[in-house]
From Swiss-Prot:
A GO BP entry: positive regulation of DNA-templated transcription
General function of this protein: Transcriptional activator of elastase structural gene (LasB). Binds to the PAI autoinducer.
InterPro entries: Sig_transdc_resp-reg_C-effctor, TF_LuxR_autoind-bd_dom, TF_LuxR_autoind-bd_dom_sf, Tscrpt_reg_LuxR_C, WH-like_DNA-bd_sf
Protein name: Transcriptional activator protein LasR
The entry's keywords: Activator, DNA-binding, Quorum sensing, Transcription, Transcription regulation
Gene3D superfamilies, A to Z: Transcription factor LuxR-like, autoinducer-binding domain, Winged helix-like DNA-binding domain superfamily/Winged helix DNA-binding domain
Domain HTH luxR-type: 170-235
Pfam families xref list: Autoind_bind, GerE
DNA-binding stretch(es), residue numbering of this chain: 194-213
Length: 239
């Protein structure tokens, strides 16, 4: 599955099952064997009732919930206070309970991987965890570092589209873009940088960034890439 096609399919999916399957397929195409996407609405700490999809082993998921591991798992606490990914290095498991958690997760086949924090535009909080199979930790880390830029994009699209499926939000007024905003976003959608767009549109890079800021505000998102996909889905621009 081509990356852009996958992003579009996430946005256009008709339900949670289809959306989850698309996300798993994209992660698999990148080289990850297991994923878990979890999201909470604003101001909620009810981890056991979070919106969760993925292909983690069912027995492990049940044990995780039964043992209350959301309050032990160091990746969970990390995601509440950071936007940076956290790799499943042995050093992050510091307490006795965390060491037990690590041993049990490893026994379930979740040895090497990373977790990407999710912070939504409407206050949603969550994580995208991805596990990779490898001969050793060094091999796993080399692989994850090589695909990290793509994972940043994937988690943005997954967050934006997943939040729309997981939680009901009031319908907002239609997004209206100026002709210049459409032009700027059109070039952004095919991967052009602000500098490249400024050359194409014969304006300053600061002017491009100004329009990008207005576009993100109108869509209520923090990522220009997500705004571009939303604009495509609304028929405001085309790829």
């Amino acid at each position: 599955m081509a990356l852009v096609d996958g992003f579009l399919e996430l946005e256009r999916s008709s339900g949670k099952l289809e959306w989850s399957a698309i996300l798993q397929k994209m992660a698999s195409d990148l080289g990850f064997s297991k994923i878990l996407f979890g999201l909470l609405p604003k101001d909620s700490q009810d981890y056991e009732n979070a919106f969760i999809v993925g292909n983690y082993p069912a027995a492990w998921r049940e044990h995780y919930d039964r043992a209350g591991y959301a309050r032990v798992d160091p990746t969970v606490s990390h995601c509440t206070q950071s936007v940076l990914p956290i790799f499943w290095e042995p050093s992050i498991y510091q307490t006795r309970k965390q060491h037990e958690f690590f041993e049990e997760a490893s026994a379930a086949g979740l040895v090497y991987g990373l977790t990407m924090p999710l912070h939504g535009a409407r206050g949603e909080l969550g994580a995208l965890s991805l596990s990779v199979e490898a001969e050793n930790r060094a091999e796993a880390n080399r692989f994850m570092e090589s695909v990290l830029p793509t994972l940043w994009m994937l988690k943005d699209y997954a967050l934006q589209s997943g939040a729309g499926l997981a939680f009901e939000h009031p319908v907002s007024k239609p997004v209206v873009l100026t002709s210049r905003e459409k032009e700027v976003l059109q070039w952004c959608a095919i991967g052009k940088t602000s500098w490249e767009i400024s050359v194409i549109c014969n304006c300053s890079e600061a002017n491009v960034n100004f329009h990008m800021g207005n576009i993100r505000r109108k869509f209520g998102v923090t990522s220009r890439r997500v705004a571009a996909i939303m604009a495509v889905n609304l028929g405001l621009i085309t790829l």
